[in-house]
Swiss-Prot record:
The keyword DNA-binding does not apply. GO terms for biological process: amino acid transmembrane transport; amino acid transport; intracellular sphingolipid homeostasis; serine import across plasma membrane; transmembrane transport. High affinity transport of glutamine. Also transports Leu, Ser, Thr, Cys, Met and Asn. Residues 176-177, 241-264, 311-342, 403-432, 503-506, 582-590 are mitochondrial intermembrane. Residues 12-22, 91-117 have a biased composition (Polar residues). The modification Phosphoserine is found at residues 29, 113, 124. There is a cross-link at residues 34, 39, 41, 61, 132 (Glycyl lysine isopeptide (Lys-Gly) (interchain with G-Cter in ubiquitin)). GO terms for cellular component: cell periphery; cellular bud neck; endoplasmic reticulum; membrane; mitochondrial membrane; mitochondrion. Belongs to the amino acid-polyamine-organocation (APC) superfamily. YAT (TC 2.A.3.10) family. One of its GO terms (molecular function) is L-proline transmembrane transporter activity. The keyword Isomerase does not apply. It is found in: Mitochondrion membrane. This is High-affinity glutamine permease.
Length: 663
């Protein structure tokens, strides 16, 4: 077949048409000369009169190679497109189906190695990694979401995930409202609750590590389906709003360097980056989050060192500062004890938002390779995040930034230098370092946006699998991505394009209003689920030895956290009806800015009760299903593993024993 006939779609093998010119040869890229050279050796003896035939055959062969290469490259595109097809075995449960106690069925995802499958064929009832599993349970295991998250990712999540808008930017307004003393007290109260919450969350996450959606599914079968439905949807809405909130914050952060470029330009760049990262699934999210968290932790450590030097007069232009700003203008804002107490209470919502995503280790349990080892380790390290990343760094900020500074959000100034961490350094004459801090703050904000995109899509997908959201959102593709739910998360991200609006700070405030208080509801349900689980275990005569990890603060820690969260909701209601500033007069805007999540939760709760006609307040302890969805650990095997581990520590170096005690 000649080149000319090939181009015209004809296949005349016997054609004598040899009309070729150099332009035809120029169409062939010289990158295929490796294919031409062997051909020259084979037909090197061709007579000169057959030169045209030689060139034609060579060109034909080269074009065939080019077509093959094109098909080869096209195969990547086809595989990428095919990866979005529904995974085999991925399907939603019927919304109409229910189990014996009337709760909505939960779809679980399990996976087992080839060794586990081989063991299943040889034994009728086996123990894998300390977990008892029957052959039927093994056969039902489906590889929907992929186990791409490693222990190093989980540990770094416990230390760095959530260090973003709440801590690095949102506290600017809180410092202005409460003063440094009120800020620290509010965060200390919330931090003590968070530690108890994470311990409860860690225990349940190990037990129910195969539940898609993590902790938002616990109350469905441990407490009350209506509570689970309302809080899960509120949690989903929270993180759908957090993604555009973080992108708006990123555009505000960029204003530190320039105000001449339209903020929407940067929103487009960051928006595309977040979507692309999540297209790579859990692995892309985990690796990006690991990098972001490393940068954030290094920035916090660097800030510690620099802030201490500035405060002691070793850098900057103000000499020794010490606790000057705690005396003038003071540690608390307000002239009366009531006003000062109100300032402390006002920190709770922002503190809850700042501590948000601490429970992310449970959300990712179904995509972790070894949750029984990684989750307890991460939960124990949470105390260091609370003490150093939050309390210590905010104390240093309070030493360096007076709450009357006009650069803080909520003061007379603008958001150009919104972060109190940047203000703490730049306001004392340090020139270069603030640029590095602001760059890491930008990475931190993008990290939380990345986590929000990941979390919201997984929550929406789990709601669909439970029958509590449209069935189309249960779609999991061949790469383990909840593709339909990710599309919804991407659409919500478009809200961020309001960054160029003059109402940018108002949008920031309203998105924060939805997100902050929602976190309290989520934490309350986690602790209630833990309390009800322990109660059901006791009533049904089950041993806690079946639990792979037990909360270090026990059920009393969960009870303390619930009590404090309820008091925080009550106190926040008081702040909403008598806001700080404006003479303490009630207005609809100030009320909903502080308490928007409450009416949303009430509406969702009532909607479920009417929809399902289920008027019970909770599932009785003796009716709680403690078999389905749960990893039942072999108590004797776990004891043996613990003894072997302790023996290795006793025989090992001293530093390992110290590290094990603290970590």
């Amino acid at each position: 077949m000649t080149l000319g006939n090939r181009r015209h779609g004809r296949n005349n093998e016997g054609s004598s048409n040899m009309n070729m010119n150099r332009n035809d040869l120029d169409d062939v890229s010289h990158y295929e000369m490796k294919e031409i050279q062997p051909k020259e050796k084979q037909i090197g003896s061709i007579e000169p009169e057959n030169e045209v035939e030689y060139f034609e055959k060579t060109v034909e062969k080269t074009i065939e190679n080019m077509e093959y290469e094109g098909e080869h490259h096209a195969s990547y595109l086809r595989r990428f497109i095919d990866s979005f097809r529904r995974a085999e075995g991925s399907h939603a449960n019927s919304p109409d189906s229910s189990n014996s106690n009337g709760t909505t069925p939960i779809s679980t995802k399990d996976s087992s190695s080839q060794l586990d499958n081989e063991l299943n064929r040889k034994s009728s009832y086996i123990t894998v990694d300390g977990i008892k599993q029957s052959p039927q349970e093994q056969e039902q295991k489906q590889e929907n979401l992929k186990k791409s998250i490693k222990p190093r990712h989980t540990v770094m999540m416990s230390l760095g995930t959530g260090i973003g808008t709440g801590l690095l930017v949102g506290n600017s307004k809180v410092l202005n409202n409460a003063g440094p003393g009120g800020l620290i007290i509010g965060y200390a109260i919330m931090g003590s609750c968070v530690y108890c919450i994470i311990q409860a969350c860690g225990e349940l996450a190990v037990i129910y590590s195969d539940l898609i959606g993590g902790f938002n599914t616990y109350p469905l079968f441990l407490v009350d389906p209506a509570l689970g439905f309302s809080v899960a949807w509120l949690f989903c809405l929270q993180w759908l709003c957090v993604c555009p909130l973080e992108l708006v914050t990123a555009s505000m952060t960029i204003k530190y360097w320039t105000t001449s470029v339209n903020p929407d330009v940067f929103v487009v760049i960051f928006y595309v980056l977040i979507v692309v990262i999540n297209v790579f699934g859990a692995k892309g999210y985990a690796e990006a989050d690991f990098f972001f968290n490393c940068c954030k932790i290094l920035m916090i450590v660097g800030f510690f060192i620099l802030a201490i030097i500035i405060d002691c007069g070793g850098a900057g232009t103000d000499g020794y500062i010490g606790s000057k700003y705690w005396r003038d203008p003071g540690a608390f804002r307000g002239d009366t004890p009531i006003q000062r107490f109100k300032g402390v209470v006002a920190t709770f919502v922002t503190a809850a938002f700042a501590f948000g995503m601490s429970e992310q280790l449970a959300m990712t349990a179904s995509e972790q390779s070894n949750p029984r080892k990684a989750i307890p380790s991460a939960a124990k390290k949470m105390i260091y995040r609370i003490l150093f990343v939050f309390l210590a760094s905010l104390t240093l900020v309070g030493f360096l930034v007076p709450y009357t500074s006009d650069q803080l959000l909520g003061a007379a100034g603008s958001a150009t230098k919104a972060s109190p961490y940047v203000i703490a350094v730049s306001s004392h004459g340090v020139r270069v370092v603030p640029h590095f801090i602001n760059a890491v703050i930008l990475l931190s904000v993008l990290s939380v946006a990345n986590g929000a995109f990941y979390t919201s899509s997984r929550i929406l997908m789990s709601l669909a699998k439970q029958g509590n959201a449209p069935k189309c959102f249960d779609y999991i593709d061949r790469e383990g991505r909840p593709a339909a739910a990710m599309l919804v998360s991407a659409l919500f991200g478009v809200i961020a394009f309001c960054a160029s609006s003059k109402k940018e700070e108002d949008v920031f405030t309203w998105l924060l209003a939805i997100s902050g208080l929602s976190q309290l509801f989520t934490w309350i349900t986690i602790c209630l689920s833990h309390i009800r689980f322990r109660r059901a275990m006791k009533v049904q005569g089950r041993s806690l030895g079946e639990v792979g990890y037990k909360s270090q603060v026990g059920v009393w820690g969960s009870a303390y956290a619930v009590l404090m969260m309820v008091l925080a909701l009550i106190a926040q209601f008081w702040v909403a009806i008598a806001p700080i500033g404006g003479g303490g007069k009630l207005s609809a805007q100030s009320f909903f800015e502080n308490y928007l999540a409450m009416p949303i939760w009430i509406a969702l709760y009532i909607f479920y009760k009417v929809w399902k006609k289920d008027w019970s307040l909770f599932i009785p302890a003796d009716k709680v299903d403690l078999v389905s969805h749960r990893n039942i650990f072999d108590e004797e095997l776990l004891k043996q593993e613990d003894e072997e581990y302790k023996e290795r520590l006793r025989n090992g170096p001293y530093w390992k024993r110290v590290l094990d005690f603290w970590c």
